[in-house]
Each structure stands twice: as C-alpha cells, then as structure tokens.
C-alpha cells in the first residue's frame, strides 16, 4: 500500500474525534461524557479502517482516555470527592476488561481449537463424515454442515474453523470429479460444496456462544451496560429450535436453489478413506481430547448452577496441559488467541466506560422518547432488521458488533417492556447469520469467494436469499420460542 493512501487511515479516526468533540454539547450530557464518546467513535472508525491491528487501535484509545481521564472519564463531582485518585481509578478502569470472565472463556476455547488442530481430531471428524456421507452430493452438503457443527462449540474463531480446517479439506473434493475453479465445470459439484462451506460456517457461528468471538463480545457489552448476561446454556437452549431447523434445512435448500449437476459418485469417499488410512487409528491424545471436549460441553450446558463457564474452560485447558494434549509453548505462541484476548478485553473496557460516563443511560432516555407509543414487539423486530441489514456496510464482524451493539442494547434498555435477554440473543444470532450476506462480511467469506467456484453474481444473489430466510426464521423463533426459555 502506498504511503499516500495509508495516511488517511491514520488521520480519519483523529478527524472523527476532533469533529465530534467540537460539536455543540447535546442537552443532558456532561462534557466529559461527550468527549469520551468522541474517542470511542474514533476507535470504532479505527477498527473499520485498521491502519494498525484492531487490538492496537483499542489499546491506543484506552491509553488516550486513561491519560486524559480528568477530562474524559470522570465527572467534576467524582474528582472533587475526598481521597479520589484519578490515576489509580483510571488504571483500574483501563485493565478492567482483562478480568472479565468472557475474555477467559474465549481464550480457553481458542486453546480447545489448538488441541483439535494439534491432535488432528478436527480433521479426522470431518474426513469420517465425508467418507460416510459423500456418496451423494446432497449428503456431502450435510457432511460439511455436521463437521462445522461439531467443531463450532470449541472453535471461537470462525476463520480458523471455516478457512483453517474445513476449507482445506473440501477444496480437494471438486477436482476428484473434474469440477475445476473459474470454469464451466465448477457448477458440476464445486459450487455447491463451496457454498455449503461458507453457509455452514455462518449458521454454526450463530448456534453456540463460543462459535464466534463477536458473540462473546456482545455478552460482555450486555453485561457492562445492564449487569444482565446470557450463559452458554442459555444461548444454546434459546437457539435450539432454530439451530435444528437450519442444520437440517440449509443443505437441502442449497441443493434446490444452487443445484449441482453431479448428484452422486464414489470418488470423494475413496479419497477420504485414503486420507484416514494415512492418519492411522485414533491415537490416545485424540481420545483424551475427545473426552475433555465432551466433558466441557456437558458442563457448559448443564453445569451453570455449579461452575462458571469460564472456569470450566480454564480447568480443561489445565488438564490439556497435564495430559500433554498441548504444551505451554502452544499457549504462549498462539498469536490468534492473544490477539483476540487483547482486542476483546480492550473493547469491553471501552464499552464499560461508555456506560460509566452515563452515555448509554442518556442515549436510552433519548430513544425512549422517540419510541414511546410504539409496540415493544414492533420496536424489537425493527431494531433487529436494521441491525441485520447494516451488515452490508461492514467488512469486520468485530467492528460491526463494536459499533452497533452498544446502540442496540441502549435502545432495548430504553423500553423496559423489551426482554433484554431475548433481544440480545437475537442480536447475537444476527451477527453470525448475517455474515452470509456479502463476500466480505466475515473471515472465511473471502476465502470461499476467492475459491473460483462462486461467481460474484451467484454469491450476492444467494447471500440475499439465504440472508432473508435466516432473518425471517430468526424473528419468528425470537418471538415465539426464546421468551419461553429465557424469561
């Protein structure tokens, strides 16, 4: 990238901060709250443009606010309190996100993913499903879906899951039937398989709390704004009917709307069998990994009254180290995990400050006045639809969640009649499901889009069709099922 095009990415967040800070102070807001919001908005712009990695953007924002805390973070009344030391208080705020249980849950889930990858268990599971179900193209679509479904609960990076585990396997399948990329033969079987790869990644990202990092970011934002939260089991149970429906419906729907020319064949099962033979029998490390994952899932679903989900993850990671499934170097060298750890903790810190300075409360009251007179159900559905469609304007799920989720939560808090747990779960599901809309919405999207099997027109058309179906089903289950199990 040329320096001339690089500098605007650095200057744009600073310009946004300056413009907002110089605007007239809105009625009902204190000056420090407005200045805090200016810096927060600048951070969001930085996350979208990424002049530097997202974690660095967030850390710079926190540093600015902490250093200038007498003017950005604390009110004159707080500063006037006897014994109030803004230096200690600002430091305490700056690192508060790193003690959030959500951060440690997602870090543990990353280590689970490392265990899957290092032992080869994730690849083995996918190959077994392909071998057993690959004789018919439709069943091969279900094999892709089930592979994603099994890996999703313990792989919080949908990019690692979709682009790092599933894609390297399924990209080998079309050439077995002479279905080549960027060629008329791509529709033979390759286009269907690749579309199933990305759509399965989006669906499974919405099914489990730990299937996608922005899901956990949303819960952190929800907790910082309201002290309410959703457990792993709450999320799973609330999504259960929609999850079952989508897992069973999507492969068939893709088969109907984007039909492969080739309907059956034996080449894929034979290839998968060859790969499994090369891997050898299930080894002891894979068995230990499988046992720990089953135990973690059971505790996440049923153990919420006895042990926190983050503590389950923390303990399982300790056992993985003791059982030599992973080693300490695997933890300290996991760049993806530490990257998410820092940006997620930093964003939760920033969201907490947005609430502490009173901005969320002020914005909620502002919305309450404009939304009064409308049915809470209509407002909730309208907010979900707007949130969902705004995905077209974001190329990062993290930036999308960071920018819009606090506003969505504030809007829900403005109307006490809106059930916050239900609304937040619908928002969370929309993050994953809405990732299907564009070829840039989430990490694996460009990988599948660039495979040569999904022409631009087809991707946008299918994204709109599947996106609309997902949205309708989400609203229906959100109104009929989720209140029954979450309230």
Curated annotation (Swiss-Prot):
Main subcellular location of this protein, as a coarse class: membrane
Cellular component per GO, a single term: plasma membrane
Protein location: Cell inner membrane
Pfam families in the record: Na_sulph_symp
Catalytic reactions of this protein: (2R,3R)-tartrate(out) + succinate(in) = (2R,3R)-tartrate(in) + succinate(out)
Family listed: Belongs to the SLC13A/DASS transporter (TC 2.A.47) family. DIT1 subfamily.
Record protein name field: L-tartrate/succinate antiporter
């Amino acid at each position: 990238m040329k320096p001339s095009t690089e500098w605007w990415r650095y200057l744009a967040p600073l310009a946004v901060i300056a413009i907002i800070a110089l605007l007239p102070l809105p009625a009902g807001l204190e000056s420090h709250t407005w200045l805090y919001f200016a810096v927060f908005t600048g951070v969001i712009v930085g996350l979208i443009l990424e002049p530097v990695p997202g974690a660095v953007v967030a850390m710079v924002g926190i540093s600015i606010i902490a250093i200038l805390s007498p003017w950005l973070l604390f009110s004159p009344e707080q500063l006037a309190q006897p014994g109030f030391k803004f230096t200690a208080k600002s430091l305490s705020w700056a690192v508060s996100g790193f003690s959030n249980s959500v951060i440690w849950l997602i870090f543990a889930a990353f280590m689970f993913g490392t265990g899957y990858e290092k032992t080869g268990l994730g690849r083995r599971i996918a190959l077994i499903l392909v071998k057993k179900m690959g004789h018919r193209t439709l069943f091969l679509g279900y094999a892709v879906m089930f592979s994603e479904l099994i890996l999703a609960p313990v792989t919080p990076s949908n990019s690692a899951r979709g682009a790092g585990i599933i894609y390297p396997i399924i990209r080998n399948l079309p050439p077995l039937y002479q279905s080549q990329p960027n060629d008329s033969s791509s529709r033979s079987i390759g286009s269907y398989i690749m579309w199933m790869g990305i759509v399965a990644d989006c669906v499974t990202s919405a099914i489990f709390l730990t299937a996608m990092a922005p899901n956990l970011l949303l819960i952190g934002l929800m907790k910082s704004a309201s002290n309410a939260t959703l457990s792993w089991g709450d999320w799973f149970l609330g999504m259960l009917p929609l999850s079952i429906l989508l897992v069973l419906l999507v492969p068939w729907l893709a088969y109907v709307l984007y039909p492969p020319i080739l309907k059956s064949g034996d080449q894929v099962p034979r290839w998968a069998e060859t790969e499994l033979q090369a891997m050898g029998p299930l080894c002891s490390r894979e068995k230990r990994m499988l046992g720990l994952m089953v135990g973690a899932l059971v505790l996440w679903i049923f153990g919420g009254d006895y042990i926190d989900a983050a503590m389950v993850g923390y303990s399982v990671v300790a056992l993985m180290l003791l059982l030599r499934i992973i080693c300490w170097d695997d933890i300290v060298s996991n760049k993806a995990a530490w990257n998410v750890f820092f940006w997620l903790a930093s964003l939760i810190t920033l969201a907490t400050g947005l609430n502490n300075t009173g901005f969320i409360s002020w914005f909620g009251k502002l919305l309450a006045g404009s939304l009064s007179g409308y049915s809470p159900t209509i407002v909730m559905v309208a907010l979900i639809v707007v949130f969902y469609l705004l995905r077209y304007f974001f190329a990062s799920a993290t930036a999308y969640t960071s920018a819009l989720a606090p506003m969505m939560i504030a809007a829900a808090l403005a109307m006490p009649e809106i059930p916050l747990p239900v609304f937040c779960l619908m928002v969370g599901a929309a993050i994953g499901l809405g990732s299907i809309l564009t070829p840039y919405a989430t990490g694996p999207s460009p990988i599948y889009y660039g495979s040569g099997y999904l022409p631009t027109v087809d991707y946008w058309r299918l994204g709109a069709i599947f996106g609309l179906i997902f949205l309708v089903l989400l609203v229906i289950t959100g109104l009929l099922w989720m209140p029954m199990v979450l309230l």
